[in-house]
């Protein structure tokens, strides 16, 4: 158990930030799953629409520090490639 006031504060702060970060990661996953579901159904227009909504969420994850930039870029790139492959 922490004895210093600042250490106690950090424990509380870390717990609250962890909760927020987990919620943010879950939100990103939800949007990505919606895109993947649209891709699986073969509906290119729905996939594009879902992708346009998911892309800013993924980038926001980078800004907020829950995703690495390369991870976000990789996710976006792979989803985009899968959407393009629907019509081909």
From Swiss-Prot:
Disulfide bonds: none annotated. Belongs to the bacterial ribosomal protein bS20 family. InterPro entries: Ribosomal_bS20, Ribosomal_bS20_sf. One of its GO terms (cellular component) is small ribosomal subunit. Binds directly to 16S ribosomal RNA. The keyword Ribosomal protein applies. GO terms for molecular function: small ribosomal subunit rRNA binding; structural constituent of ribosome. NCBIfam families: S20 (TIGR00029). It comes from Rhodospirillum rubrum (strain ATCC 11170 / ATH 1.1.1 / DSM 467 / LMG 4362 / NCIMB 8255 / S1). It comes from the Bacteria. Keywords: Ribonucleoprotein, Ribosomal protein, RNA-binding, rRNA-binding. The gene is rpsT. The lineage of its organism: Bacteria, Pseudomonadati, Pseudomonadota, Alphaproteobacteria, Rhodospirillales. Pfam families: Ribosomal_S20p. This is Small ribosomal subunit protein bS20. GO terms for biological process: translation. The keyword Ribosomal protein applies.
